Amino acid sequence: MPFEILHFRGSDEIIKDKNLERDIKSTLAYVDDALYGSIYRGELLRQALDEMDWRDNGDGELKILDGRRYMYKGVKRGVAIEGNFSVYEYILEGLFRLQVGFDKGRIETGILMLTSMRSEKSSLGTSRDLAIVEVEQLYPTISMQVSIALFALGPPIISNGTEDGGD
């Protein structure tokens, strides 16, 4: 499974109305391809979102709060992309960051990218099941229309230098 998108409270309708369905799917597929097995995910994510025109702004569109450096990973036509691939537990902070932008009128919906990798010892079920329960439990604090994209990026692949190709 490369990635899975879960839509909550009609976020898919907002994305459809903004004619961003294909754009979002191709962006998430590109992020998945670029980050799978990588070590430096933060920089690669910024580069991928920049190449897909999610970071192209001159008017502070990425900013969450005026006068602060808090920024989304990307924004396009009122849809923000936020995420963290280190820990699934970023779901709470990520949803909060999106909700602040929504409440301030900066965005209409958001996509939260998370890792689907969690401890095999977890008794809480799959990341998909947990995301559904947590978004429901966070209502009414998190009340916006939001989508969650779960990625299985695998562990970093570190080359030992014996592969064919290169110089």
Where are these regions (language model features)?
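Conserved beta-strand signature within the Rossmann-like core of class I S-adenosyl-L-methionine
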Residues: 106-116
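Short catalytic-loop micro-motif centered on adjacent basic/acidic residues
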Residues: 80-84
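Short acidic, S/G/P-rich loop/turn micro-motifs used as interaction or catalytic elements
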Residues: 86-90, 117-120
